[in-house]
């Protein structure tokens, strides 16, 4: 599994790389994002700039650089061209709704770097079969924040407990496209603990996850706290993979569902 960390500071990116973070995630998406996620405890990377692509690619040697661009618009081609020219390894398209948008994204990139779709709209979910028919999709990440908003849900992990994530994954698997979903907290933190979410990633054979806001909170203390929690997460993932036949995945989901019921009681 690839672990992703949102970061635009080259010095910090190198530190994350050295501790084994697989991908540094540069977030250029700004179009419509504030309005969609207003009032939510989500990461909006206002300080990230397209000029950071070259700064990061010039210092990364083992970690890949993933760049989330803006939703498709009249400036997309120039944005994509600069990202590729400046050294991005993977480009991620957010907020797409149609096969046509995906095809345009794939055509502009033209196999020069890896492509990743961020599936996070109800329209894309309903049109998943048409979208998957496009050649050239390397990866799909299911974005729980915006997808749960798009579907009018109250908590992003309802998509997991309600079977929507698994439904999407079953659609993806025949196409041999790598996939991941959402973010993850340290093993013992988060509204739904990182350990419970990690077990779902293992059960569903996910190949990527983003280190979420509770990991950033550890950086307020010191880098060592972050690294210790990250290494524990990686080691736990290896343990679960090697012992998956002994893991009670069914009971894990029962616990997740109970926790979500309690969370929603407090929200409503």
Task: Enumerate the predicted regions with their spans.
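C-terminal alpha-helical cap/extension of soluble enzyme domains
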Residues: 76, 174-268
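Hydrophobic faces of well-ordered beta-strands that scaffold small-molecule active sites
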Residues: 1-6, 24-26, 65-69, 91-93, ...
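Glycine/small-residue-rich loop that forms an oxyanion/phosphate-binding "nest" at active or ligand-binding sites
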Residues: 61-94
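Glycine-rich phosphate-binding active-site loops on the catalytic face of alpha/beta enzymes
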Residues: 24-34, 88-101, 139-151, 200-221
